[in-house]
């Protein structure tokens, strides 16, 4: 059965020493239609500059602060509603999970099937995804 084209979604707090290797590895091993990165505005500008010469699938960078604006949410409003008590997790961690799992709400033309990838997971070999 031929695989349908798919996108990869990554939440990125900050570009690190391995970011290029992760993105180029994903492109090499999985040939995604596109890679969507959700990050803070300042990081988005830096990443656009850094990635110009990288060998990646098309990169689309999205502002995490207003990612859910079309459905009436902002990062601040979501985090303000969380009452975590003595949880080990921060409101920002929960928001990160919403960004990854709710990517279809904030990314126009996202593939029907998409892969959520952690930004620090280096793809050293191809694993079956579907």
Regions found by a protein language model. Give the residues of each.
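Short, charged/polar "capping" segments at the starts of alpha-helices
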Residues: 17-18, 42-49
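GT-A fold catalytic core of metal-dependent nucleotide-sugar glycosyltransferases
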Residues: 99-130
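Active-site-proximal specificity loops/subdomain of glycosyltransferases
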Residues: 46-109
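Short loop->beta transition adjacent to catalytic acidic/histidine clusters or analogous donor-positioning motifs
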Residues: 4-7, 27-37, 58-59
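Short, well-formed alpha-helical segments that are part of the catalytic scaffolds
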Residues: 15-28
């Amino acid at each position: 059965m031929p695989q349908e084209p798919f996108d990869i979604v990554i939440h990125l707090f900050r570009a690190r020493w391995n970011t290029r290797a992760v993105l180029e590895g994903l492109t090499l091993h999985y040939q995604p239609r596109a890679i969507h990165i959700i990050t803070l505005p300042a990081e988005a500008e830096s990443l656009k500059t850094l990635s110009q010469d990288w060998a990646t699938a098309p990169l689309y960078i999205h502002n995490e602060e207003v990612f859910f604006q079309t459905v009436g949410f902002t990062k601040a409003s979501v985090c303000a509603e969380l009452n975590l008590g003595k949880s080990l997790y921060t409101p920002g961690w929960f928001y990160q999970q919403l960004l990854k799992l709710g990517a279809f709400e904030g990314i126009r033309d996202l593939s029907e099937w998409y892969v959520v990838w952690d930004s620090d997971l280096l793809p050293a070999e191809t694993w079956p995804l579907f």
